């Protein structure tokens, strides 16, 4: 492909701010857009059909708790969280960490309000074998 398909979820996050309907197709991986559910939880009007993700304009992004579905989808949710009002909490950031070394620190260095903290105990976070669950909080300072 002319564009690395690994970049598709990150471009999809940018499409959330477009003024017109946008779509992107991944011709390699059928389940590339696992981030679409998180986009919708944030308030976007996003839907997938096969390998195509379509985003309609007009969705107002508001912070909430979302789960990083995979490496690139998690990074896309971080970008969407930066565009959202309020605080976005991304659970399972280990997906992001395994592919983007120092991602949180780089974004913070660019001025993003992003930090690591213990995962919220609201029942929406799946239990893992880790002793302490970690999440990324984006959008407010403490």
What role is predicted for each listed range?
Residues 1-142:
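Short, structured segments at the rim of ligand-binding sites
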């Amino acid at each position: 492909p002319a564009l690395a398909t690994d970049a598709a979820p990150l471009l999809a996050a940018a499409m959330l701010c477009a003024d017109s309907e946008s779509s992107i197709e991944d011709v390699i991986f059928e389940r590339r857009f696992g981030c679409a559910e998180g986009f919708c939880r944030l308030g976007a009007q996003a839907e997938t059909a096969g390998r195509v993700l379509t985003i309609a304009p007009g969705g107002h992004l508001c912070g909430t708790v979302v789960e990083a579905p995979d490496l690139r989808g998690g990074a896309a949710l971080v970008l969407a969280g930066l565009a959202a009002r309020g605080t976005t909490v991304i659970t399972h950031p280990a997906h992001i960490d395994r592919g983007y070394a120092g991602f949180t620190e780089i974004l913070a260095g660019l001025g993003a309000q992003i930090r690591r903290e213990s995962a919220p105990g609201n029942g929406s976070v799946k239990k893992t074998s880790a002793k302490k669950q970690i999440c990324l909080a984006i959008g407010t300072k403490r």
